[in-house]
Amino acid sequence: MPAFNRLLPLASLVLIYWVRVCFPVCVEVPSETEAVQGNSMKLRCISCMKREEVEATTVVEWFYRPEGGKDFLIYEYRNGHQEVESPFQGRLQWNGSKDLQDVSITVLNVTLNDSGLYTCNVSREFEFEAHRPFVKTTRLIPLRVTEEAGEDFTSVVSEIMMYILLVFLTLWLFIEMIYCYRKVSKAEEAAQENASDYLAIPSENKENSVVPVEE
C-alpha cells in the first residue's frame, strides 16, 4: 500500500501531462474560498474560450466587496497588468496565463480584513470578419480568512479510518492467536491421553498384542 500511494501521484501527473499535450483543453476549476492569515491566497478565475483560434480583445476586472460594503475595483488587465489604487495595492500579483483563459490573481500576506466577496469580470470582444461579438463572464469568490488553518475533513476521515483498521487488525490477530493456542493445546492433550492409555495397558496384554512372526 505505501508503494501504491507513492506511485499514484506520479501516475496522476503523467496522465495530466499526457492529456494536456495530446488534448489541450481548458477546465473551469472553482477557486478555494478559505485562506489563513499571513499566507498567500490565489483567487482562481478561469474563463475558457470555445474557439481558441479566434483572436479576441480581453479585459479583466477584479472587484472586492467587504461585508456590508460596496464593490470597488482592485485590479485591472487591459493591454497589460494594472493594479489600481486600493487597500490591496502592493499585495496583488497577476497569476494568469498567456492566452488569458486563466485570469487569476494572488493576494499576498492575507489579513482578516480581506474577508469578503471577490468578483472577476472577463470581457471579450471577438474579431470575426463579419461581426465583432462581445461576451462577458463573471465569477464570484466568497473568501473567508481565519487566524489558523482548520483541519481538513478528508484528512480527519482518513485518520479515523486508519485507527478503525488498526483496531480491526489487532482484534483479528488476537483471535487468530487464541484459535491457534487452543488448537495446539487440544493436540497436546490428545497426545497425552493416547500416551496415558498406552501406559495403562497391562504388560501381559502388551506381550499378547505382539504378533508372532513365523520363521
UniProtKB/Swiss-Prot annotation:
Signal peptide range in chain numbering: 1-24
Family matches, as PROSITE patterns: IG_LIKE
Matches recorded under Pfam families: V-set
Membrane topology listed for this record: Single-pass type I membrane protein
InterPro entries found in the cross-reference section: Ig-like_dom, Ig-like_dom_sf, Ig-like_fold, Ig_sub, Ig_V-set, Na_channel_b1/b3
Keyword Translocase listed: no
Sequence ranges assigned to domain Ig-like C2-type in this UniProt record: 25-138
Molecular function as annotated in GO: sodium channel regulator activity; transmembrane transporter binding; voltage-gated sodium channel activity involved in cardiac muscle cell action potential
Transmembrane segments: 157-178
Top-level division of the source organism's lineage: Eukaryota
Quaternary structure note: A voltage-gated sodium (Nav) channel consists of an ion-conducting pore-forming alpha subunit functional on its own that is regulated by one or more beta subunits. Forms homodimers and homotrimers. SCN3B is non-covalently associated with alpha subunits and induces the formation of alpha subunit oligomers, including trimers. Interacts with SCN5A/Nav1.5; regulatory subunit of SCN5A/Nav1.5. Interacts with SCN7A/Nav2.1; probable regulatory subunit of SCN7A/Nav2.1. Interacts with SCN10A; regulatory subunit of SCN10A/Nav1.8.
Record-given protein name: Sodium channel regulatory subunit beta-3
Phylogenetic classification of the source organism: Eukaryota, Metazoa, Chordata, Craniata, Vertebrata
